[in-house]
């Protein structure tokens, strides 16, 4: 019988990535034995690996996260190339967040939301409650001052949240999660970037077929040609992949 509550680790450029077979495996792992895992979830794609290579602060933030998983198809292919026996699949962060929220709603797990524009955050809360009856115990939009951070951490701690999701983009969200965990370590933290915008329909995600083919990056590039400079950086990652330098 396959064990769905544990998962192997695979090393790419020194980063230890969790090898989830599929979304159900990820959920069973995070909710093992009816207990929500505690720690920080960080989605890893090729761009984030490049940033971690060049920025020691980002590298330290990622290294400190307990649950690093393959969000990008390039990373999945690299794991499979380096470890031919690996049964690992892409788990998109946006999809994982929705599945976590659905599971949290089913089990009554308390959730705290951070980030996004005020109106987007309000719509996210309303939709989560309507769709999955999520127990949202608090929220804070992304427009707060540095001197308000400590008060936010105290609010999160007082709320008793077991899941805290932060939509502020990298590395801001990773920094906030790291600092908040000092005050409130008894939760699963997840950085979700622009997920609230996608969830509420403010930003259109790539059609399912593009996602299935691993071409979500191309869809975003065609939709936003200004991303070309960011995409050209990925040539360095391709060199790592094809020269076996992972």
UniProtKB/Swiss-Prot annotation:
Lineage, top ranks: Bacteria, Pseudomonadati, Pseudomonadota, Gammaproteobacteria, Enterobacterales
Pfam families per record: Glyco_tran_WecG (PF03808)
Signal sequence extent: none
Name of the protein described by the UniProt record: UDP-N-acetyl-D-mannosaminuronic acid transferase
GO molecular function ontology, one term from the record: lipopolysaccharide N-acetylmannosaminouronosyltransferase activity
UniProt EC number: 2.4.1.180
Pathway membership: Bacterial outer membrane biogenesis; enterobacterial common antigen biosynthesis
Highest taxon of source: Bacteria
Top EC class, one word: transferase
């Amino acid at each position: 019988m396959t064990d769905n509550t544990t998962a192997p680790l695979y090393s790419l450029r020194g980063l230890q990535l969790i090898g989830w077979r599929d979304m159900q495996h990820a959920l069973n792992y995070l909710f093992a034995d009816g207990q929500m895992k505690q720690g920080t979830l960080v989605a890893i794609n090729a761009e984030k690996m490049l940033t971690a290579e060049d920025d020691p602060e980002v590298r330290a933030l990622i290294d400190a996260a307990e649950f690093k998983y393959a969000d990008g198809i390039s990373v999945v292919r690299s794991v499979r190339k380096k470890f031919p026996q690996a049964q690992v699949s892409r788990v998109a962060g946006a999809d994982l967040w929705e599945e976590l929220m659905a599971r949290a709603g089913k089990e009554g797990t308390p959730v705290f939301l951070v980030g996004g524009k005020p109106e987007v955050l309000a719509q996210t809360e309303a939709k989560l409650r309507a769709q999955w009856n999520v127990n949202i115990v608090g929220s804070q939009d992304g427009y707060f001052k540095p001197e308000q951070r400590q008060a936010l951490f105290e609010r999160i701690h007082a709320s008793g949240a077991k899941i805290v999701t932060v939509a502020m983009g990298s590395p801001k969200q990773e920094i906030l999660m790291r600092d908040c965990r000092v005050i409130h370590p008894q939760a699963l933290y997840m950085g979700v970037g622009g997920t609230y915008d996608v969830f509420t329909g403010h930003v259109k995600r790539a059609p399912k077929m593009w996602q299935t083919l691993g071409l979500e990056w191309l869809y975003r590039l065609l939709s936003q040609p200004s991303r070309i400079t960011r995409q050209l950086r990925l040539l360095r990652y391709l060199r790592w992949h094809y020269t076996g330098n992972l």
